[in-house]
Amino acid sequence: MAGKLQAHNIRIRTFIHATEDPEKVLEALETLFPEEISPKDVEFEVIETEGYFGNPILVVDAEIKHSRNIRKFLENLRGLLSKEDRKYLWEHAEEKVDETGTFYIRFDKQKAYLGEVKVSEGEDVIHVRIKVKAFPMKKEAVVKAVREWLEGED
């Protein structure tokens, strides 16, 4: 049975480039969210900025803070991960967790738009940062908690 991962908050970020349809990018983001979490349960912020060559970019930030919604998001996310992606994240947990206890995952934005959740190390991604609760709050404890969450039956 998979362990339960507890978190203080979850932050999701992606970029909308001038060549992309904002509605499609937002649909890709929705792929990560369970139906039980409504948009009013998530703090969204959109920031307009420019790329290196002056091209317009929208930065979309979403944050989940309430424990009930965090729990639902994490349960849903684990269910969306393929066995291969869970294995990959388990094997790379040391490098995907920082000293502050944040677990970083990147998902392929194009595949998410098609309804598929796929871990990616590419550039065109949806960034998910999970601020994990662990005791003691040390990297080793967070890595252990993340690995326990990733383990288990389908």
Swiss-Prot record:
Keyword terms of this UniProt record: RNA-binding
Gene3D superfamilies recorded: 3.30.1440.10
GO molecular function: RNA binding
Keyword Acyltransferase: no
Domain of life from the UniProt record: Archaea
NCBIfam families listed in its UniProt record: PRK14555.1-3 (NF011142)
SUBUNIT field: Homodimer in solution.
Biological role: In vitro, binds efficiently double-stranded RNAs in a non-sequence specific manner.
Protein name: RNA-binding protein PAB1135
The organism's taxonomic lineage, starting at the top: Archaea, Methanobacteriati, Methanobacteriota, Thermococci, Thermococcales
